């Protein structure tokens, strides 16, 4: 009996995707790597894809994969672009993008309890209705919560609030054997799921800390004659006493090519094209 048929016999209501043309969508991410390279070196098309609707369904998938020794690839919005969600030896892709409920916004505790596939943009919209905002979020605000926990942690507002792991109050995971656990930063296993790309299991839920929505926020563009001058300024700025009186959320470096591309996308010369911004 084929693996897909074995799984189908115990899957119950779990949605299964196994048509070749649909599976092909899961053989790449947002990154632009020529398919002839990946397909020559790896088996990038999954054996099949599942879209679980509950933690119990995820547990069933992982227990089956563990028993059959089949690779499992958790997948969110696939916006990272470095191949972390691309299969290399076929296996089962667990698509968590539909697993996206915002379970609760707690105004008193200033927290958001969300499912793994919740989009950062959706959380921010819902939280702002209660006067709260995300502390940090990735450059792709349409990526998923578990996706950023599993792959990164530094981005917008990190200069002020630090790594994403500092803003996770707790998270629920399902281990490779199919066991669910709720972990806090005090647990040793907590760090196993930060920036490890799903190697130790699947993040299914997280409780995130929020902040009061600021009254105002301003962006500033500073132009420099070259990158050395810009980096020297940043070094002086972050080490100066004045920074204690300024609420800086993020510092970004942009080069002339980036500004040129931005102007091209906007079909107008909106920004001055400087060697360093």
Language-model segments: residues:
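N-terminal flexible segment immediately upstream of the FAD-binding catalytic core
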Residues: 1-63, 79-110, 210, 253-268
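Flexible, glycine/charged-enriched surface loops at secondary-structure junctions
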Residues: 14-21, 71, 135-138, 237-262
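Glycine-rich, histidine-containing beta strand-loop boundary motifs that form or position
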Residues: 20, 74-78, 96, 116, ...
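Short, well-ordered beta-strand elements within core beta-sheets of diverse protein domains
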Residues: 48-53, 218-223, 277
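FAD-binding subdomain of flavoenzyme oxidoreductases
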Residues: 101-239, 243-247, 251
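A conserved active-site cap/scaffold subdomain adjacent to cofactor or substrate pockets
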Residues: 268-277
């Amino acid at each position: 009996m084929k693996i897909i048929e074995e799984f189908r016999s115990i899957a119950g209501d779990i949605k299964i995707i196994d048509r070749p043309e649909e599976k092909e969508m899961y053989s790449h991410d947002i990154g632009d790597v020529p398919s002839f390279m990946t397909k020559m070196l790896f088996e990038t098309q999954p054996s099949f894809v599942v879209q679980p609707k509950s933690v119990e369904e995820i547990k069933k998938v992982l227990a089956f994969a563990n028993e059959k020794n089949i690779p499992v690839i958790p997948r969110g919005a696939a916006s990272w672009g470095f191949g972390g969600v691309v299969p290399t030896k076929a296996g089962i892709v667990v698509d968590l993008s539909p697993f996206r409920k915002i379970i609760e916004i707690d105004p008193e505790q200033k927290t958001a309890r969300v499912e793994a596939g919740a989009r950062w943009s959706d959380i921010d919209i819902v939280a702002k209705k209660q006067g709260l905002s995300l502390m940090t979020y990735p450059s792709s605000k349409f990526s998923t919560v578990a996706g950023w926990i599993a792959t990164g942690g530094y981005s917008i507002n990190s200069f002020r609030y630090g790594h994403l792991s500092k803003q996770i109050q707790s998270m629920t995971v399902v281990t490779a054997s199919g066991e669910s656990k709720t972990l806090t930063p005090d647990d040793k296993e907590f760090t196993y799921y930060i920036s490890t790309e799903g190697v130790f299991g699947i993040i299914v839920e997280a409780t995130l800390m929020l902040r009061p929505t600021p009254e105002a926020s301003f962006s500033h563009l500073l132009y420099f004659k070259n990158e050395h001058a810009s980096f020297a300024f940043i070094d002086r700025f972050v080490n100066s006493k004045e920074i204690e009186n300024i609420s800086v959320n993020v510092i970004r470096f942009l080069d002339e090519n980036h500004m040129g591309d931005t102007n091209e996308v906007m079909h107008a010369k909106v920004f001055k094209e400087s060697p360093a911004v």
